[in-house]
């Protein structure tokens, strides 16, 4: 079976611990990151919640969980109840803090427009260009991503690769994964993470 795959990326990201601000005396003041998402409430509902994903202008605005495997949340909702739609989830092999070089998120393409249905719309270059900003909120930081390419693929293990021996291997992997993209954007800077 074929699926739509979107490859967003980051070129720079903030320190997970603090943001820096300049005060009136021009001294750097460290302030703690405060998430726009109440992760304490989400954690009390389900401790498997690791993030929240939002793509402005789309229906994608969901919590992200990570299970012990890639099967549990495929057909279970956030509360662990059976659900055709499942829950958006991070590959079990990725690091929960999104520090893997390639962070793989899964979600169903639901006919009612929910979950990752809007990913299939990225095949249109105009839609791709208008919805290229992707935000991942974690308890430690806010990650702003830019869409790199949309590819119609079959799910296979190569697309799940999360560890790389070198920067060259990672760059080669990016080229391989985005080859044949139906839509894409120019790369701005050096890619440090792929999602």
Label for each model-derived stretch:
Residues 1, 5-12:
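Short, small-residue-biased leader/transition segments that mark boundaries at the very start
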């Amino acid at each position: 079976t074929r699926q739509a795959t979107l490859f967003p990326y980051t070129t720079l990201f903030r320190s997970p611990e603090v943001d820096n601000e300049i005060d009136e005396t021009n001294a750097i003041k460290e302030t703690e990151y405060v998430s726009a998402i109440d992760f304490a409430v989400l954690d009390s509902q389900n401790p498997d919640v690791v993030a929240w994903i939002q793509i402005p202008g789309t229906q994608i605005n969901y919590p992200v969980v990570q299970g012990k495997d890639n099967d549990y949340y495929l057909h279970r909702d956030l509360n662990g109840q059976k659900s055709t739609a499942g829950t958006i989830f991070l590959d079990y092999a990725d690091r929960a803090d999104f520090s893997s070089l390639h962070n793989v998120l899964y979600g169903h393409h639901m006919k009612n427009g929910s979950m990752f249905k809007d990913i299939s719309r990225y095949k249109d270059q105009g839609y791709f260009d208008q919805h290229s900003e992707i935000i991942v909120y974690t308890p430690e930081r806010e990650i702003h991503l830019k869409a790199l390419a949309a590819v119609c693929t079959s799910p296979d293990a190569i697309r799940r690769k999360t560890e790389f021996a070198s920067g060259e291997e990672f760059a080669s992997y990016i080229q391989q994964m985005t080859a044949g993209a139906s839509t894409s954007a120019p790369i701005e800077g050096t890619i440090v993470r792929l999602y």
